[in-house]
Amino acid sequence: VNLQKEVLFYNEEAVNSLVEGIKKKSVKKSEKDGAPFGNDVKVALEYFLDLGKKMGMKTTNYDNYIGEIEFGEGEETLGILGHIDVVPEGNNWTHPPFAGKIVDGKVYGRGASDNKGPVIACLYAMKCLKDLNIKLKKKVKLLIGCDEENDWECIKYYFDFLNKPQPEIAFTPDAIFPVIFSEKGIFQFDFIKRSDEFRDIYLDGGVATNSVPDTANIVLKNINESKLKSSIEKYNENKEYKIYYKEIAEGKIEIFSQGKAAHGAMAEMGYNSIQNLFCFLKQFYTAQNEMKNVIDFFDKYLKMDIEGKELGLKFVDEESGDLSINIGKIHIIDNELRISFDVRYPVKMKLKTILAQINKVKKEYAFEMEIIKNQMPLYKEKDSYLVSTLLSIYEDVTGERGVQPISLSGGTYARALNNCVAFGARFKNQKSVAHQVDEFMDLENFKMLLKIYVETIYKLAN
């Protein structure tokens, strides 16, 4: 049987299912009546499980934390780990973010590539094998996570709380081809400062710690407008991402900063609007107060830096490359200012090195610190069975030759398992659109995903 040919018979149906899946706005909200990540995520999970059920597969919903679609027999299990939760859509979309609109051979929408498109491709690859009655030695389980973009409570619930056994072998279609052999560590923390002076200031930037913010704004009182205007004009010279202002009430002026959104793991693909705002404020803001203290901190330790150089964290190793840092959010609520950091650190770097340096900076500027999460790096030998098998499948299906496994700054579910790596679903020649405005799935690439994943499931499950 020519599996790559057979699976393409499902292409049209799979694309329609993806369009419908994108329409389910699955951004995390607070817990509600048996929906730990909010009702929207629950509805999306039910949609994906229902697809599996209609295909005649066994489906299980584990209390709306995580879903499972399974087929086949066998003592051992091949696991496929995907997720259907998405990051907030942000602003400035050309196409509606939750409509699944198809334009010029691309289906647009939040989650189209991260990660609903790849999940659908894997599901229809499973359906193809099932419909053809192809006998596999392992059973195949597609796990559908609902909290990948935040705290991984879905995975913790499945493996830690429910104590489910790990699959003997697994992959996650939530990164980039050809195959990922190492993933950097992910360390997220907040710096917090409290002062009654903050009650008079509105400050807001960013929507997610792991996204590069594209807007940030601050409202200040009793500002000299002509001085502000000339400072902005001077600052904006030869800059692509600019600062703007407007008067919003008598004596109150709002200052806006532009940036470019990107995934926080690839900060170099974006331009950070929060850092841009504070670079400007350093030149303009003169009052001696707690806000000035925060501006000075940005100037000394952050500027527009994304490599942690200013913070004294610069580090590089051969396996995984440079450390990177993203300031994902900043907010003032009542008397509390909070800055959210996302550090991606190389596999050979020790977390205690990072903590020692950050603690020094924290003390210098009298911040409190809250650790949000740490995920240890992942490293698999390039010649391991899993990495080398996936590499050869990729070469066979695409016809590319001499490709090498790569390292990833992003974090995938792979690091939650003993024998799992990320495999796709973005092709190397494709720009990353995850977490960005006008995220899409290219429909020609989608066909290639069907072909790659049907071969992958067939080979790994035998």
Briefly describe each language-model feature range.
Residues 1-110, 131-136:
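Acidic/His- and Gly-rich active-site-bordering loop/insert found
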Residues 21, 25, 220, 277, ...:
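Residue-level signal for inorganic ion chemistry
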Residues 50, 258-261, 265-334, 344-349, ...:
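An extended, acidic, His-containing surface patch that forms the Zn2+-binding/catalytic region
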Residues 77-144, 150, 163-164, 436-437, ...:
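Active-site metal-coordination/substrate-binding segment of hydrolases
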Residues 87-103, 187, 191-193, 247-257, ...:
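Acidic-glycine-rich active-site phosphate/pyrophosphate-binding loop
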Residues 115-195, 225, 229, 233, ...:
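Acidic/histidine-rich catalytic neighborhood of metal-dependent amide-processing enzymes
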Residues 119-129, 158, 220, 277-281, ...:
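Buried hydrophobic packing segments
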Residues 181-190, 195-204, 209-260, 264-324, ...:
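Acidic-enriched catalytic cores of C-N bond-cleaving enzymes acting on peptides and small amides
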